[in-house]
Amino acid sequence: MNKVVLLCRPGFEKECAAEITDKAGQREIFGFARVKENSGYVIYECYQPDDGDKLIRELPFSSLIFARQWFVVGELLQHLPPEDRITPIVGMLQGVVEKGGELRVEVADTNESKELLKFCRKFTVPLRAALRDAGVLANYETPKRPVVHVFFIAPGCCYTGYSYSNNNSPFYMGIPRLKFPAEAPSRSTLKLEEAFHVFIPADEWDERLANGMWAVDLGACPGGWTYQLVKRNMWVYSVDNGPMAQSLMDTGQVTWLREDGFKFRPTRSNISWMVCDMVEKPAKVAALMAQWLVNGWCRETIFNLKLPMKKRYEEVSHNLAYIQAQLDEHGINAQIQARQLYHDREEVTVHVRRIWAAVGGRRDER
């Protein structure tokens, strides 16, 4: 199995292909990407037969920006007979996966695939039973075993394969299912909520998104991102010349500062989070974020970088490299992740966490 399917946002196939070609090449896993515009997926075909498996084992999925999900597959199954689609699929997976922990029958995230998605949901139940009988799936779902993927690109036409549960997206089609809260001031609130799900392990939420933390929201108006912080019982400085939603001000947890987010300087020394979703050139935002991190004005940050029309992967890579270089120059240890989230449009969301080492004679924090 030498092919890797990567699901992405429709319209960003070229960026997804450029990224996987670059990052696979850095690990000396060479191949080429097959790209069909607005299809919502990319196929990276490795030159060596076992390199697909090697790629999804060795390259951290968390290091990918434009891929929502990935899995290794074999040859395309075509012209599945309508009276028995199950037998050929089971045959393709036997000897490839043994006692898989979960089955996902998926499609790309396009308008054309919506009808096909309905079929996938109905088809999952009988296929799961057949795969269990064949030993491809375990008799019960387990998160420690590989995930079996059946990816339909057209009716009667699918790829079959697997991903590793410790190096993939835990979400079906790579998309967290989030509900827009009616009391939130704007739909942008879902970007920050999704970022928390993607970047912060669920078992660390109580510690890292804790009650009583202090946070700053730069470019906050009308308060979509502030809402997520308030919902987690944080105290928030919302920085924007534009007005904040009255519902947020009524909580008593929000201090509205009518200032330019680029000029604001915090006066507190215990700010846990800084978040930022400003419409500005990505290089300018990256420079501001680096300044906050280098000066230790926050422990963690989530921010958006708006993408240009062309060379989007190159632009994001350049901005992330700039932030990393600034941190390195000042001897700061940090973890950087970036992802084009489901709720992002022409942008990517970045998470940076400063990590303080325990050094004798020095406080752990700042």
Curated annotation (Swiss-Prot):
InterPro entries: RlmM_FDX, RlmM_THUMP-like, RNA_MeTrfase_FtsJ_dom, rRNA_MeTrfase_M, SAM-dependent_MTases_sf. The gene is rlmM. It is an enzyme of class 2 (transferase). One of its GO terms (cellular component) is cytoplasm. Belongs to the class I-like SAM-binding methyltransferase superfamily. RNA methyltransferase RlmE family. RlmM subfamily. Its main location: cytoplasm. S-adenosyl-L-methionine binds at S188, C221, P222, G223, G224, D240, D260, D277. Its EC number is 2.1.1.186. One of its GO terms (molecular function) is S-adenosylmethionine-dependent methyltransferase activity. It catalyses: cytidine(2498) in 23S rRNA + S-adenosyl-L-methionine = 2'-O-methylcytidine(2498) in 23S rRNA + S-adenosyl-L-homocysteine + H(+). Catalyzes the 2'-O-methylation at nucleotide C2498 in 23S rRNA. It is found in: Cytoplasm. The active site is at K306. Monomer. Pfam families: FtsJ, RlmM_FDX, RLMM_N. This is Ribosomal RNA large subunit methyltransferase M. GO terms for biological process: methylation; rRNA processing. It comes from the Bacteria. It comes from Shigella boydii serotype 4 (strain Sb227).
